[in-house]
Amino acid sequence: MGMAFSKLFDRIWGKKEMRILMVGLDAAGKTTILYKLKLGEIVTTIPTIGFNVETVEYKNIQFTVWDVGGQDKIRPLWRHYFQNTQGIIFVVDSNDRDRVVEAREELQRMLNEDELRDALLLVFANKQDLPNAMSPAEITQQLGLQSLTRRAWYIQSTCATTGDGLYEGLEWLANALKKAGHE
């Protein structure tokens, strides 16, 4: 009975659900971000082989976030998570200048997939607390984001360990999903 009321209230008050795919190269901070959003604390992580999935509630939206491992050997498995994805969070280690070209190649490969043609793109320029971190403007240029004329995208500087920028990113995603009619 309680569940019936809950579903009724969700319909009346308009709770939305959105499927988000969070990907990026290994060690970019995806799992740390997921659990900082979910639990509000830093958890000890190990490299993700497979995926983690959690629901994160923000502003009456229930984001189902799929955090998929980023090691090169398992990146081909990303495509199995594309179906019904409304938003992509692509996490970049802003301090890893040696692999930014690799990140660009993976992002471009994914954005060319037909199943993701309508998905919004949020880039988290993570690890901004490190002294050698690339700025969001530099990452925008390195990833070629300015050439994405047919896709809504946004880049947000973040620090997964402090939580800086994470909710600002979700705010953009929530507003962009509403504008795009994905609600």
Swiss-Prot record:
Family matches, as PROSITE patterns: ARF
GO cellular component terms, semicolon-separated: Golgi apparatus
Major location (coarse): Golgi
Record localization: Golgi apparatus
Gene Ontology BP term (one): protein transport
Lipid linkage positions (N-myristoyl glycine): G2
InterPro entries listed in its UniProt record: Arf1-5-like, P-loop_NTPase, Small_GTP-bd, Small_GTPase_ARF, Small_GTPase_ARF/SAR
Protein transport in keyword set: yes
GO MF, one example: GTPase activity
Sequence positions that bind GTP: 24-31, 67-71, 126-129
Key words of the record: ER-Golgi transport, Golgi apparatus, GTP-binding, Lipoprotein, Myristate, Nucleotide-binding, Protein transport, Transport
Keyword hit for Methyltransferase: no
Pfam families recorded: Arf (PF00025)
Protein's job: GTP-binding protein involved in protein trafficking; may modulate vesicle budding and uncoating within the Golgi apparatus.
Similarity-based family: Belongs to the small GTPase superfamily. Arf family.
NCBIfam families: small_GTP
Protein name: ADP-ribosylation factor
Naturally occurring in which organism (per UniProt): Ajellomyces capsulatus (Darling's disease fungus)
The gene coding this protein: ARF
